[in-house]
Amino acid sequence: MAVLDQKKLVQSVKELLNYLEVSQWKHKPNFDFLTKSKVIDREGLRKMKMVKGLYTAKTSGSTGIPVKVEKSFMDYVWYIATNIREFRWRKWDVKKNLAQIKAGATKSDFVGWGIPQEIEPIQGMKYVIGYESISEIQKWLEEKNPHYIQVAPSIASQLDFTKISNYIDHKGTGEVGGSMYSSEECGTIAIQCPDNPEVMHVMENIIVETDPDGVMIVSTTTNPYIKRYKHGDVIELGECNCGRTLQTINKVQGRVRNMFVLPNGDKKWPLIGSKEYYDKFGIKRYKAIQTDIETLELHIISEPLGEKEIELILLVKEWINSPVNVIIKYVDEFPNYKFEEFVSLVK
């Protein structure tokens, strides 16, 4: 990430938080903003020429199609402010302790949640761990004994929160069952309504449409590249009686991650290095299938990699961190019906 003017960042976040307190009750999406924009898909986004931004977001989402987007200063401001908004909507006490289970992270302890002190002067501890095995995460949580836990729903479903005596609440994003709906390329799309938790409210910098099949088309006012972008998720728009005028999402279909099964029967989130697939190997789309305890098939749409297959296999093994046999298979296409980028056939 480029060097930031921290004073400017904090001031911008404070101003945005003040704005959001009022705008949630009066905001209306400006669909005129979209009149000259054509719908683009992930391939269109990938081919788009972009100017270097504050930072680069890389993802394959739930489709197995890697993309990257250059992010602006205001993208980052909205990212911080909407995360603080979610804490406030959920009435989390920032003076208590937070555990964060985050992809690619190493075990660390921090004084403070990472919220600027000018906004929240007194904060509890933040404990961070990566996507380790479920048993390791469970043991770590019991040792740290946090009040709040930030964790992906698929991992949360494998954990026993009753063994954490301080536990109050958990939240997550990226999948069905999450309290926040977000993506790397779009940022925070929607947050669970604090009054009606069965629905989510779309953020003020986001405009959501759907095609005839219910596939979400998302635009953001803070990023020049996310304009009428066909995201790939199927959603259902609706209404909420809480009084907020924000767009409302009733349902998000799909986006549930299967767990990778380890040789000892333990499970973990399947990180397989996919953010590097397009830039390093030219892989346009992929799907990983764990056929048994010892075998992972990586199906890819790509030109033949030749000797680079070995490099790809080593990358997958490094990220999955398990003695698995990786087999590369080339395919021409994937059926879109119920596509999942990772499937485990291990019972």
PLM region spans:
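Active-site glycine/GP-rich loop and adjacent strand/helix microenvironment
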Residues: A2-K14, P121-K347
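Alpha-helix boundary/interfacial micro-motifs
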Residues: V69, V77-A81, S108, V199-M200, ...
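Conserved AMP-binding loop of ANL adenylate-forming enzymes
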Residues: I84-E118, G124-V128
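Short, acidic Gly/Pro/Ser/Thr-rich loop/turn segments
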Residues: P66, T106-S108, N223-Y225
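Nucleotide 5′-phosphate-binding alpha/beta core
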Residues: M1-K58, T63-N97, G104, Y148, ...
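Short low-complexity stretches enriched in small and charged residues
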Residues: V51-K58, I101-S108, N250-M259
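Glycine-rich, histidine-containing beta strand-loop boundary motifs that form or position
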Residues: K71-S72, K102, P153, Y181
